[in-house]
A protein has these predicted regions:
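C-terminal catalytic "cap/lid" subdomain
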Residues: 1-114
Length: 114
């Protein structure tokens, strides 16, 4: 198991720089890519990926499984649960992304991938 802080890195000159919003998501996906991880778990404050904002419609339930393409469409439509760049790195090696809730770790979340 690898734990790594996110949202920062170094530029081509070695200068430390901060990533934009969602940078921690991308950092995690890239780290999973680099170490050939079996999966990348993205822990957040919602129960997984939803078809729409769960705060606007609290009766909906998270989606159990999504393909990369299905997740891409949801993220392109404005879902902010995961940075879209994560899908690029996960798709390159077929690494599943599992979106889970930090405050409700007993829930399975949403599995994205092949």
């Amino acid at each position: 198991m690898l734990f790594r802080s996110g949202f920062y890195g170094a530029d081509e000159y070695g200068k430390i720089c901060l990533f934009p919003r969602g940078g921690s998501d991308t950092t995690g996906a890239l780290a999973a890519f680099c170490i050939d991880a079996d999966a990348y778990e993205n822990w957040t404050d919602v129960d997984g990926v939803f078809h729409s904002d769960p705060q606007l419609d609290p009766k909906q339930t998270p989606i159990n499984r999504l393909t990369y393409d299905e997740a891409q469409r949801i993220l392109d439509a404005g879902a902010a649960v995961l940075h879209p760049d994560c899908l690029y790195w996960a798709r390159k090696k077929g690494t599943p992304i599992i979106v889970r809730n930090t405050f409700r770790p007993h829930l399975p979340g949403t599995r994205i991938g092949p």
